[in-house]
Curated annotation (Swiss-Prot):
Family: In the N-terminal section; belongs to the N-acetylglucosamine-1-phosphate uridyltransferase family. In the C-terminal section; belongs to the transferase hexapeptide repeat family.
Needed cofactors: Mg(2+)
EC number: 2.7.7.23, 2.3.1.157
Active-site annotation: H360 (proton acceptor)
Keywords on record: Acyltransferase, Cell shape, Cell wall biogenesis/degradation, Cytoplasm, Magnesium, Metal-binding, Multifunctional enzyme, Nucleotidyltransferase, Peptidoglycan synthesis, Repeat, Transferase
Chain segments carrying region N-acetyltransferase: 248-455
Record's subcellular location: Cytoplasm
UniProt name for this protein: Bifunctional protein GlmU
Function: Catalyzes the last two sequential reactions in the de novo biosynthetic pathway for UDP-N-acetylglucosamine (UDP-GlcNAc). The C-terminal domain catalyzes the transfer of acetyl group from acetyl coenzyme A to glucosamine-1-phosphate (GlcN-1-P) to produce N-acetylglucosamine-1-phosphate (GlcNAc-1-P), which is converted into UDP-GlcNAc by the transfer of uridine 5-monophosphate (from uridine 5-triphosphate), a reaction catalyzed by the N-terminal domain.
Positions that bind UDP-N-acetyl-alpha-D-glucosamine: 8-11, 22, 73, 78-79, 99-101, 136, 151, 166, 224, 330, 348, 363, 374
Annotated organism of origin: Pseudomonas putida (strain ATCC 700007 / DSM 6899 / JCM 31910 / BCRC 17059 / LMG 24140 / F1)
Chain sites annotated for binding Mg(2+): D101, N224
Class in the EC hierarchy, top level: transferase
Region feature Pyrophosphorylase, mapped onto this chain: 1-226
């Protein structure tokens, strides 16, 4: 069975009170529409058709991809009208309709729904709620068969008492769609063309409407305002937390933990409070992450330790290495096994060999640092001349004294030592000691300046 997916994303979202189109508002670092597209792709359809309207150019710009067909809805005349705009592009056997502001829908739920759809049967996703206010109601006959969907504003009191609501997500035979779209009417309280009216048409045409429900009602929750958006965010984070804990992660507090990307984890991982994981993060076995850390597009090898208040981006921490507290690893930073980066150390495009150490108050940029080398406190690599970047190379077993300025390009060879307070501008040969500072001069009888007395 071939599949086309239509995603409705044309709404303005006035209750968001924002210049940003509603579907571009983020949940967990990705737009709501981005989440829906991600789920759609996992179903491997032959086409994904995104119906856009308000803020169309910005939506297209943010999400443009070769596998997406953007369809313009110039006037927002209802969900049925929106689907009709995509009709000329639909060639598959089945059409699945999704919504750009319903980001938490699970792929497994959609797979169960699609399994119920064929040329003689619609698949309709419904949800049972204690308070279904705002939802269209699922009307069934005495045998429990779905006969129609009545929108909330058009429902009578008896219909409003129904607890089963329409999520709007449905799978239907493409061969019938054009006929049903042509028969839609806007004779209703909203003056719109409701997609839900095809349910009654399908029943009248002798088709069966088979229903499916999500495991969790939050899967089908949309966001019309900032409060609902925050509810989706928190539910997403708790869901991700449960997923990670099921894989062997200890979260000190799942309510104070955020995932904003794709995270893969090993076993016996410990993550403290207020940790944010962004982009693609790989965490291997026995890793420990302290509180208040931000980790983005980073790999943490087995047994690595990230201490409190550290910020890592585009970095790789080797097996048994550690960083922090208050460490910053910028893109291109690599720590080999058992390397150590302490508090208030910043790395950028720097590679620390196995067992190398930079304990505190240090900046290392564009640097290659050999195994077991020790970097003293207050050391900086002077890697930028205002126009170009240059590299600092340190061999194995180098000892850099405190408060050194290493003016790149420069090489300090294996086993060399630099004295505290040195400004190193020339190569230091293997095993040598480099002293590059002014000789101390003591002045006897020195008197400190005195404040000038005001008259």
């Amino acid at each position: 069975m071939s599949l086309d997916i239509v995603i409705l994303a044309a709404g303005q979202g006035t209750r968001m009170r924002s210049a940003l189109p509603k579907v571009l508002h983020p949940v967990a670092g990705n737009s709501m529409l981005g989440h829906v597209i991600h789920s759609a792709r996992q179903l491997q359809p032959q086409g994904i058709h995104v119906v856009i309207g308000h803020g169309a150019e910005l939506v297209r710009e943010r999400l443009a991809a070769d596998d997406l067909n953007f369809v313009m809805q110039n006037k927002q005349l209802g969900t049925g009208h929106a689907v009709a705009q995509a009709l000329p592009a639909l060639t598959a056997d089945t059409v699945l309709v999704l919504y750009g502001d319903v980001p938490l829908i699970e792929v497994e739920t959609l797979q169960r729904l699609l399994a119920k759809a064929n040329d003689q049967q619609l698949g309709l996703l419904t949800v049972t709620l204690d308070d279904p206010t705002g939802y269209g109601r699922i009307v069934r006959d005495e045998q429990g068969r779905v006969t129609a969907i009545v929108e909330h504003k058009d429902a009578n009191d008896a219909q409003k008492a129904i607890k089963e609501g329409n999520t709007g997500i449905l799978a239907l035979p493409a061969a019938r769609l054009a006929d049903w779209m042509g028969r839609l009417s806007n004779n209703n309280a909203q003056g719109e063309y409701y997609l839900t009216d095809v349910i009654a048409m399908a029943v009248a045409d002798g088709l069966v409407v088979a229903t499916e429900q999500p495991h969790d009602a939050m899967e089908v929750q949309g966001a019309n305002d900032r409060r609902q958006l925050s509810e989706l965010e928190r539910h997403y984070q708790l869901r991700e937390g449960r997923r990670l804990m099921a894989q062997g992660v200890t979260l000190r507090d799942p309510a104070r933990f955020d995932v904003r990307g794709e995270v893969s984890v090993g076993r016996d991982v410990l993550i403290d409070i207020n940790v944010i994981l962004e982009g693609k993060v790989v965490i291997e076995d026995d890793v420990q992450i302290g509180p208040n850390c931000v980790i983005k597009n980073t790999t943490l090898r087995k047994g690595a330790v990230v201490k409190a208040n550290s910020h890592l981006e585009g970095a790789v921490m080797g097996e048994g290495s550690d960083a922090g507290p208050f460490a910053r690893l910028r893109p291109g930073s690599v720590l080999d096994a058992k390397a150590h980066v302490g508090n208030f150390v910043e790395l950028k495009n720097a590679h620390l060999g196995e067992g190398a150490k930079a304990g505190h108050l240090t900046y290392l940029g564009d640097a290659e640092i050999g195994a077991r080398t020790n970097i003293g406190a207050g050391t900086i690599t002077c890697n930028y001349d205002g126009a170009n970047k240059f590299k600092t190379v340190m061999g194995e077993d180098v000892f850099i004294g405190s408060n050194n300025s290493l003016v790149a390009p420069v090489e300090i060879k294996a086993g060399a030592t630099t004295a505290a307070g040195s400004t190193i501008t020339q190569a230091v040969e293997a095993g040598d000691l480099a002293v590059a500072r002014a000789r101390q001069r003591n002045i006897s009888g020195w008197k400190r300046p005195e404040k000038i007395k005001k008259s």
